Amino acid sequence: MKITNLLIALTSLFIFNSCKKSASADQAIQYQLATINRTAVVNTPVSAGSITWTSGTASATLIKLEAKNSSNTEVEFKSQMAQQIDLFSSVAATLGNVIIPPGTYKEVEFKIQMTPNGSTAALTLNGKFTSGTGIVTPVTFLVNSMFEIKAEQANVSITDNSSTTAVTSLNLALLTTGISQTMLNNATVTNGTIVISSSSNTNLFNIISANLIQSHEVELHH
């Protein structure tokens, strides 16, 4: 069974929207998580195929902001939770709030930690490959260990009269950059599904995991 080459990556996108607020105390940054670009075209020398991700979940346990404040002192703000997130919800899932004093921060790192919960994986993505010849094969990607999404920004300003929402968008269009058609053609199929995990098709898992950890960018909107 031919499975076409696939290019997917993770892009972490943080969107900040400001609105007026009367309080002048520490401010809450609300973290949200969503997915974008759920279908990718995959090319072969003969004809193009596609992959469509149709469902997925994440087990979020910690959100964190690390930075240097105006005194050049390293600071950390975090909040713990235990939430099973539907990554394919029509609206971004809210993870919780990180409380931070107003001010200007530099070398800012935004982090979301995922951790397995019992038999539930830290991250699951389900979908299907459609080859250039029209053959459809289900696929599941599983992360069964703790991992962290991290994105960086040079400078961030938090005022005492604004609320901020940080939306992390997982771009499913670039996650498997570096995976060749030959590797997919040789993938092990278990009960009709290509399972990509730390114990199945590990060569594919290692590439996707590296992209998941490393491929991030941050965009700020005030």
Give the residues covered by each predicted segment:
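C-terminal motif of bacterial Sec signal peptides marking the signal peptidase cleavage site
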Residues: 15-18
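A short, solvent-exposed, low-complexity linear motif enriched for acidic/polar residues
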Residues: 20-222
